[in-house]
Amino acid sequence: ASFWPAIIEEHEYYRLLTCTFIHFGISHLLNNMLVLAYIGDNLERALGKIKYLIVYLAAGVGSSAVSAVWSMMKDEYSVSGGASGAIFGVVGALLVIVIRNRGQLEDLNSRQLMLFAGFSIYHGVMSAGIDNMAHISGFVIGALLGGLLYRRKRYRKQNTKRAAGTW
């Protein structure tokens, strides 16, 4: 799990990655996996496997780092874990991509994603024990990476005119 004294003082930097694979209970794990199953494949199809993995891991590690620094600055000694920062990164990247595609990508639209992100952040703020800094920073990291990594597919119009004398 992510615990800033272990990361900073004991130099256990691997915790920034491994904490994204640790969950605090079956409902925590199932909630994250359901969200990831619903939206993750859309982002993978839009970006490809490698870029998707970059977004997921960078948002996971980045949000863990931001959360650890935030806890250290507030002098809090909380333990953090779960894939939520990485998943919020997927949501952020997907939102940018959907917006770039005029608000629609496959079965998703920008309104759905903004409502999901808004309600999730609201739930986190209203609930105890939620790492809101990881959620928000994961979303921002994902949105930035989505903007950097995504390139819209451009379809060239086929030339339907035939030159005289050709088949």
Language model feature labels by segment:
Residues 1-167:
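A detector for small-residue-rich transmembrane helices and their helix-helix packing motifs
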